[in-house]
Amino acid sequence: VDYLVIHYTAVDLKDTLDIFMNPESCASSHLVIDTDGEIYELVDCLDGHVYRGWHAGVSEWEGVQGLNDCSIGIELVNYNGNVFPFTEAQYRSLQQVMARFKEHYPDLRDPERVLGHEHIAGFRGKADPGILFDWPRFYRENYQGLEAPCRPAVCPKALQESLLQLQKSEPELQTEKSQFWRSVSLLTETTIRLIAEAKTGS
């Protein structure tokens, strides 16, 4: 294991587990951490034996491509990390998980090896874990005494302000709420991808 990649789910816990437990989805993450801090291990990783997950997709970081081959993925249950803060319980569970990972996987003792999905796939519009993930807190709690790398969010502030307004349109029914925010996340990704393409002229 060379890297750890942090994501948000874009749907609630039930829909997250349904997606990752369905072989036809062609997606899997090693861990899911619910808003109450409950940790779900879907692909083995906590005991020092790790299997490949399918969470990174087409990805690149500092010349390394295809990070599914060399990373662990953690999904934090959150409809959109550019709209909703992550919970205290999730940060506490991240501390527990990080302690295990640093024990078993020496490369993860280096704070530079922890990334967001947006940092390895922002060119595809990925925007997680998002603006509201507290990277300084994460590094302070898990890498005390080590210099924390900069992990800027790819979501522009103007786009985030527009996303925040969508909370007023959120459906009341839980089943509809997940679908609504999943659609918002897809719209977020498309917008960020178009911005990236405009900057590169592609």
List the predicted regions and their residue ranges.
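Basic/polar, cationic surfaces and motifs that engage anionic cell-wall
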Residues: 80-202
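Active-site-adjacent loop/helix surface patches within enzyme catalytic domains
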Residues: 2-108
